[in-house]
From Swiss-Prot:
Major location (coarse): cytoplasm
Name by which UniProt lists this protein: Phosphopentomutase
Keyword vocabulary terms for this entry: Cytoplasm, Isomerase, Manganese, Metal-binding
Entry-linked InterPro entries: Alkaline_phosphatase_core_sf, DeoB, Metalloenzyme, Phosphopentomutase_DeoB_cap_sf
Pfam families: Metalloenzyme
Gene: deoB
Length: 418
């Protein structure tokens, strides 16, 4: 029986990418800086199960250093690598598409102006078609600060809050009760169509509740309106070949529901874990279970909260054995990330980083993966390896790491003297 489980720790980078300087991210290191922050506070980061799968070894490949305050295990239970991205952006669709074997090699559209960010013609069309009294925001912003600033004005005026960031994104925040959730979704669908000529990757509905800046809170009813991948992903190929793809969390939205057989919605990491375990119980032969753990990014990366990020990682690590216990002998488990979001970095945007690839099962020996002592060429090696695992035709990008021979019995030993 052939199954695969792909867990995406959204934004969990492990050191700046080779081209990070072009993005203003030279020196970014989500894992390394979280570990440093915790070590400096006398509470070393504790991720024993991720460590046993090769997390710290992957970080060592990416940076040449061991994360501060950790002791890498001398023996491992998984294969590991550090993967770099060739897609043009450092956003969620680019990372996920490339993970699925389809890198975004084109340039996304962006709204670079920090204020008055959107073209007047676009906003006028949105206001007219959606019959709005106007809009608020029209700027670069992070989600909670803009609610604290404009939430009360939104409730009083009925004008939705529109904003963007360094990503290719158009976000709309509106109150679930005062504006209406269905109305927000309908507004986002209008915006999605209007934004097609601008080549914007995502429109995101950001519903919230509360009555004052102190009580405003975003809800779990977020919805992403993405464009379709330009060519079939490994998800689409598996689906078209008679297999099944169970997308947990926002996976369906990220891929514009292309190739996703069933969508299992859940909000919060514990609920996402529960849904993943239920999906594994349901998954039969030739099934891919794919989950995005989004809170690392939205709650801790963008909000520059290294303590919260560390605690979320430790909570994830504590639950990881529940997934491991459900694996069958031929299952392939892969843990990775779609980009970085260093919570100690300047600003509030993603960071261009390498990501871990931690793989277990399917006959993989504990070792570095890939072609250069563990460094994968692209995120797309994951998609290519999944294609091989499921017996699909090859992807146009990436190399299969399942067939690479081990580099020797000592290849996964730790060298703590580095």
């Amino acid at each position: 029986m052939t199954r695969a489980i792909l867990l995406v720790l959204d934004s969990f980078g492990i050191g700046n990418a080779p081209d990070a300087a072009a993005f203003g991210d030279a020196g970014a290191d989500t894992l390394g800086h979280i570990a440093h922050h915790r070590a400096a506070s006398g509470r070393p980061l504790a991720l024993p199960h991720l460590a046993s799968l090769g997390l710290y070894h992957a970080h060592h490949l990416a940076t040449g250093e061991w994360a501060e305050g950790i002791t890498p295990p001398e023996t491992l239970d998984g294969a590991y690598a550090a993967a770099a991205e060739i897609s043009s952006g450092k956003d969620t669709p680019s990372g996920h598409w490339e993970i699925a074997g389809v890198p975004a090699l084109f340039e996304w559209g962006y709204f670079p102006d920090k204020t008055q960010s959107f073209p007047p013609d676009l906003l006028e069309a949105l206001i007219e078609q959606a019959k709005l009294p106007g809009v608020l925001g029209n700027c670069h912003a992070s989600g909670m600060p803009i609610l604290e600033t404009l939430g009360e004005a939104h409730i009083a005026s009925g004008k939705p809050i529109v904003y963007t960031s360094a990503d290719s994104v158009f976000q709309i925040a509106a109150h679930e009760t005062h504006f209406g959730l269905d109305r927000l979704y309908a507004l986002c669908e209008i915006a999605r169509e209007l934004l097609m000529p601008y080549n914007i990757g995502r429109v995101i509905a950001r519903p919230f509740v509360g009555e004052t800046p102190e009580t405003f809170e975003r809800t779990g009813n977020r919805r992403d309106y993405a464009i379709e991948p330009p060519t079939p992903t490994v998800l689409q190929k598996l689906h078209d070949d008679g297999g099944k793809v169970l997308g947990v969390g926002k996976i369906g939205d990220i891929y514009a529901h292309c190739g996703v057989s069933n969508v299992i919605k859940a909000h919060g990491h514990d609920a996402l874990f529960d849904a993943t375990l239920e999906a594994l119980d349901e998954a039969g032969d030739r099934t891919l279970v794919m989950t995005n753990f989004v809170d690392f990014d939205t709650l801790y990366g963008h909000r520059r909260d290294p303590d919260g990020y560390a605690e979320a990682l430790e909570a994830f690590d504590r639950r990881l054995p529940e997934v491991l216990a459900k694996l069958r002998p031929d299952d392939l488990l892969i843990l990775t990330a779609d980009h970085g979001n260093d919570p100690t970095w300047t600003g509030t945007d993603h960071t261009r980083e390498q990501v871990p690839v931690l793989a277990s099962g399917a006959g993989l020996a504990p070792r570095p993966l890939g072609h250069d002592d563990g460094h994968l060429v692209t995120f797309a090696d994951i998609g290519q390896s999944l294609a091989t695992h499921f017996g699909l035709s090859p992807m146009a990008h990436g190399s299969d790491f399942l067939d690479v021979a081990p580099t020797g019995p000592s290849s996964h030993a730790s060298t703590t003297g580095d």
